[in-house]
Structures are given as C-alpha cells and as structure tokens.
Amino acid sequence: MNIIDQVKQTLVEEIAASINKAGLADEIPDIKIEVPKDTKNGDYATNIAMVLTKIAKRNPREIAQAIVDNLDTEKAHVKQIDIAGPGFINFYLDNQYLTAIIPEAIEKGDQFGHVNESKGQNVLLEYVSANPTGDLHIGHARNAAVGDALANILTAAGYNVTREYYINDAGNQITNLARSIETHFFEALGDNSYSMPEDGYNGKDIIEIGKDLAEKHPEIKDYSEEARLKEFRKLGVEYEMAKLKNDLAEFNTHFDNWFSETSLYEKGEILEVLAKMKELGYTYEADGATWLRTTDFKDDKDRVLIKNDGTYTYFLPDIAYHFDKVKRGNDILIDLFGADHHGYINRLKASLETFGVDSNRLEIQIMQMVRLMENGKEVKMSKRTGNAITLREIMDEVGVDAARYFLTMRSPDSHFDFDMELAKEQSQDNPVYYAQYAHARICSILKQAKEQGIEVTAANDFTTITNEKAIELLKKVADFEPTIESAAEHRSAHRITNYIQDLAAHFHKFYNAEKVLTDDIEKTKAHVAMIEAVRITLKNALAMVGVSAPESM
C-alpha cells in the first residue's frame, strides 16, 4: 500500500474510533473521504456527520464537533480541523508524513512507483500489427507509443504482460504484394508484360524489392507461377518485416512475440475453430456462404466466415487468432486498433462468446487519427518523397523522445494535432523539453552538491522541509504509485504523461521559490535527498512512456 493510501486508511480508522468514543453509532456506516476541489478547504474532507444524522438523531454540526473533539489528531497526522457548511469536516494534515516518501524513493530506485505484489493476471497486449506491405506511418506511430507505454504501466502495476505483434502474412493483401513484386521484378529484367494488380503496391520500397530480387535471384523467372508467387510472398514479407522491426526498435518499441497469421493455417487452427463453431450450432449456410450468428451476442448483424466462392473472410482467421490467445492462458486480451476498425469490436467479442469465453476479457482501444501540423497547417505528404510521411521521417524530424511523448499526451480515443514545430523547440513551451529539463536541472544541482561534499543519503532530518512548494512537490512524488495504478486500471497511458508535466511544474516552482544548496547544512542535506527522490520519480515516469531522462541539456 502506498503512503497516500496508508494515510487515508489511518484517517478513516481514526474517524471510526472517534465515532465509537463519542457514542454516536453502534454500527458505523462507510466513511468516505475525498480531496476538496479547493485546497484552501484542507487535504481531505468527509460528510460522515451528515450521514450519521438519522442514526445519532442530532444536528450534523454537533455530530461533527463530537467527532473532532474525540479524534486522535497525532495518529491521524492532522494538524488542523474545520467544520464547514451543514457539517462537512475538513482535515489539514501535518505533512511531515510525506517526507517518508524520500527514503522510499531513494532505496527503491528504478523500481520506485512499481507495485511489489503481482496481480496474478496474464495480459496479452497486441499493438501496431501493421500489414507488411509498406512503411509505418503516423497512425502506427501513435499505436506503437501508446501500446508500449501501456505495457510498461501494466507491468509496473503488477500484471504479467506479453507484448505481441500480429503479422498479417496471409490473405489478399499479401497476394497483391507478391503480384506487385512480380511486376517490378520482371520490369527490372526488361519484361513489361506483367501488369500490376488492381490493388497493387507501387511504393518505392516495393519497386526496390523487385529490382533487388532481379539482381540477386534472376533464376526466379524460370519458376512456375505458383512457386514464383510463393517465393515473392515469403521474400516480400521478410523484407518488409525486417524494415518494420528496425524502425520499431529505433522507436524504442519492443515485442515479446511476432505472431504469424500463416501459422494459424499451418497448425490447422482455423479449421479447428470453424469445426467448433459448427458443432456448437452457431454457424449456418445462406446464399452459398457460411455465416456466424453473432447477433446472438449483441452484434448488429450476423457475419460471413466463408464467402460463396469458398475463400475465407478476414474475420475467420481473426477469430482463430483470438481463441489462440485465450488458449495460451491469457486472462485479459487488449487490442489497439486503428479508427477504421471500430466496427470490429462487437463481432470479435461475439465470436469469443460462442466458445463460452467472457467477452469482457477482450478490451479494444480505438486509436483516433493524428494530424501532423507545421506552422499551423496540416502536412499530409513528405517534402522529400511526395508520399505519406513515415515513422522514420518523424523520428528524423523531431526525434524519438519528442515523438513518443507527444503521441502519449492525449487519450487515444481523441483526435490529436501533432505540432512538429513545437516538438523541435528547445523551450519550456515544448512539453517534453520542459519535463526533461527538470531532470537535467536536478542532475546539475546534485553535481554541485557532490562537489561541496554533500552526498545523497536516505538518512536525514527531514523536519527542515517546511516550504509550501516543497510540501506540494512531495505530495506529487507520493502520488506516483497511485497514478500508475489508476493508469493501469483505466488503460490510460496519457495519465502518466500528464503526471510528468505536473511533477516537472511542481519542481520548477519549488526551484524558483527556495534555494536547494544553502549555508544550513542539515536543510541542504534534506533538500538534496528530496530532489534526488524527485529525479528518480521523473526518470521512472519518463521511462514508462519510452522517453529518456538526460543529465544535461
């Protein structure tokens, strides 16, 4: 239990003890305490006096006074109590309890903020999963940044997380990729008789694959059409995936599993789920096609599994894939989908229900669109290539840190304008610069302290920390673990980014209000330890969203 929860629990226990002591109730109702909207009204407040009115048959202000008179303020860490309005009790805490967070942060280091106890739940988090048919773009970048941050947050909160990328290496898009490579392969050999498929890929990278294969493997031209296309499928996917993996690694995004769609066919899992759904009575034949009764499970219409030409829809392998996730022992399945996949939510959930799997175990987050902005105008095409702007170009333009930070600043279900000019600014208007500068500033102060012979130690007299800005800063440090737990519970990576901004702001305010290094050696030691706790917290929080914490800027 974190220090904030400990103090809240102690306060509730002491309020209950006070009610007993005052003889106000034989059975005490739930005591709810909350943080007042206005900090002038204390650190915590409760309406328990009004709740007890009918039980105690007394005026709520009288009840409130009886609670105040019988409260052990020392145990409750309370220095002042006010009774407000009809009977609200406002508590002002003796904030010295907050200084306990300093040695805790220093001792735990890069594990500070992490929940020690495992929640005992396995989470499979699938994100990015872009088709291996071209470069990653800004939508994939948001998916990667949010997905990787969410994996870090869930891990810190005690979940067992597996990060997975689903490789769409089967189906029509890969056939079109192979046909496109075939066209460019023969063009490079001087044969223009192979036309591009209607939905073919004509990007520069696909042209380069064709040329490269013509140069290195001209013998492919003599293969049968079936063997040739099989080779182009394999080599095309390998080439594209190698490029995607390289870009994602540079974007500080890593995966535990790369799951191939083709493996579902090879292992017979698609036929297995199809047979199982038929056996359970959830499929039927109509118009020459095979359908799944997803309307039995709140979908708006039934879905086709096998088309009337005998080919599978995309839905069937997706069902097999998600059932495979369940079979692997995962308790929670989280998918991050692009905005164009919104209609997939109900049908996927319905498909799990056909197997008796609680569809609430599947959580789908929809990533809304990102617009790249420059000088107030949307930038749709690359100035260099004339094509859609790629993840690599974004990394080259603004850097990995800025891209990761900006893409996790907003809830993924909201549209986001990515201001590339702001992301490059070295000013406090740039959110990532503002946060990283706070870390670098602390490192500079710690270096000065060391030069003066003052080492960071968790064993200090922290009673010298009385400045209001210092107390507010410590409150923010103490709020790190609750923020992680909240971000994990709500699957909200942007809560960490918001926290980083607040923590950096509180540090800058403290820095501007009070000198860290003073002639008072005991106070200086306490302040040095405190800002080390802040530095650790900042670094850990930045790491959660995949951003570095530089020691100098």
Swiss-Prot record:
One of its GO terms (biological process) is arginyl-tRNA aminoacylation. It comes from the Bacteria. Keywords: Aminoacyl-tRNA synthetase, ATP-binding, Cytoplasm, Ligase, Nucleotide-binding, Protein biosynthesis. Pfam families: Arg_tRNA_synt_N (PF03485), DALR_1 (PF05746), tRNA-synt_1d (PF00750). A motif ('HIGH' region) lies at residues 130-140. Disulfide bonds: none annotated. Belongs to the class-I aminoacyl-tRNA synthetase family. Monomer. PANTHER family: ARGININE--TRNA LIGASE, CYTOPLASMIC, ARGINYL-TRNA SYNTHETASE. This is Arginine--tRNA ligase. It comes from Staphylococcus aureus (strain Mu3 / ATCC 700698).
